[in-house]
A protein has these predicted regions:
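Non-transmembrane functional regions of envelope-associated proteins
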Residues: 1-149
Length: 149
């Protein structure tokens, strides 16, 4: 994201199907690995359901057509999965935040300690929660990186 891309593509956030097209093009041009320092924590505002909610007076047929269009988050997730080399961001939260619909990606973290090294739990900051991407994106990534905000 820079001034040139904002001038060409338009105001951020871009619809995720458009981000998916940019990612596909980047890999076709030879990108080896792609990392996002962006957290896609909320559903795309341009998903059909969100568009239906924002427009008044739509007829039943139009509502059904809009809801039948694949969600931009799913399109982006499939692009991430097919690229196989995309890392998405997450960040830690100082307070506990529970998403009822999101199970942990991993049930536990393997802890290793080199001989003579301090115990990791003595110097790693404890956090209350983690802000992740919507499931359609989170599950498809090859990796996840913690962003410090």
């Amino acid at each position: 994201l820079d001034e040139d891309s904002l001038s060409e593509v338009g105001q951020w956030p871009w619809p995720r199907n458009q981000v998916a097209q940019i990612v596909s093009t980047a890999f076709k041009l030879g990108t080896a690995v792609l990392g996002f320092d962006i957290i896609f924590a909320e559903p795309d505002r341009m998903n059909g359901d969100n568009v239906v909610k924002s427009l008044v007076g739509l007829d039943t047929e139009t509502i059904a057509k809009l809801r039948s269009i694949p969600k931009n988050d799913s399109i982006f997730g499939k692009t991430i999965k097919s690229a196989k080399r995309i890392v998405v961001g997450q960040t830690v939260l100082p307070i506990e935040r529970v998403y009822q619909d999101r199970k942990p990606l991993r049930n536990r973290v393997f802890e290793r300690q080199a001989k003579g090294a301090p115990k990791p739990r003595e110097w790693v900051t404890e956090v209350g929660g983690i802000l992740r991407n919507v499931p359609e994106i989170e599950r498809m990534a090859a990796g996840h990186g913690i962003l410090a905000l």
